[in-house]
Amino acid sequence: MERQLEAYCAHLRNERQVSEHTLLAYRRDLEKVIEYCNTQGIAGWGALQIQQLRQLIARQHHQGQSSRSLARLLSAVRGLYRYLNREGLCQHDPASGLSAPKGERRLPKVLDTDRALQLLDGGVDDDFIARRDQAILELFYSSGLRLSELTNLDLEHLDLAAGLVQVLGKGGKARVLPVGRKAREAMQQWLRLRGIGGPRDGAVFISRQGNRLGPRAIQMRVKAAGERELGQHLHPHMLRHSFASHVLESSQDLRAVQEMLGHADISTTQIYTHLDFQHLAAVYDSAHPRAKRSKGTDS
């Protein structure tokens, strides 16, 4: 089983070009299945049956695994069996027809518009670190980039004159995104201080030593900005969520937001409609004369 898992991981890395983060998550999930099979005396992937996989899912659920984690595990198993079937190594899929236990869908945390502007409109010193960090914040919020997409940006991916940036998303899929006026200005100010010829690679966001900033360093800079400007915890994905929520709230164009976020399935994007409804419901409750609740009543 381990040998076939290694072959599948090599297929994901070399042919599907999945990210190392996704590859590691799938490997961990499939190693859990192997561990379970070993304890149950199941000799190989071809011997694993649907009722046994259902038992594993139930056990993981009782141990506190979230519905999202279990859905990912089942996705990893389905992907493996598709590969095994295609290679002629197996002729069934025990995950077919199985679904993860349903759980509460947590809505993503977002900044409201006023808080986003408070974060971005603070004064910026004209120095290397301040200009770089401001450009990072503006680009996250302007274009809805994932952390990995911003980390991997090279100078050749920018066309600030046209207000565009090209990113490489999940599964190696490229997409071109608009860059707003404020973000373009912040990027131009940063590139002026960054210099074009000095650093040894073409990374857009670099350290003083000329090295590409890694994901952890960018997370820490965003966190520091959140604490300094807002007095709250802030992470890159919250800026992506805020971008999506605010664009959807203004445009009501779910398909456009899906394309900008790089979601393969529109159901992933639809979670932002729940956020928009929350906002509308709050406005209604506070503004409609027949909606205002009397003090001390629950209905």
Curated annotation (Swiss-Prot):
Signal peptide positions (record): none
SUPFAM superfamilies: DNA breaking-rejoining enzymes, lambda integrase-like, N-terminal domain
PANTHER family attached to this UniProt entry: PHAGE INTEGRASE-RELATED (PTHR30349), TYROSINE RECOMBINASE XERC (PTHR30349:SF81)
InterPro entries: CB (IPR044068), DNA_brk_join_enz (IPR011010), Integrase-like_cat_sf (IPR013762), Integrase_catalytic (IPR002104), Integrase_recombinase_N (IPR010998), Integrase_SAM-like_N (IPR004107), Recomb_XerC (IPR011931), Tyrosine_recombinase_XerC/XerD (IPR023009)
Descriptive protein name: Tyrosine recombinase XerC
Gene for this chain: xerC
Gene Ontology molecular-function annotations: DNA binding; tyrosine-based site-specific recombinase activity
Domain Tyr recombinase: 106-285
Stated family: Belongs to the 'phage' integrase family. XerC subfamily.
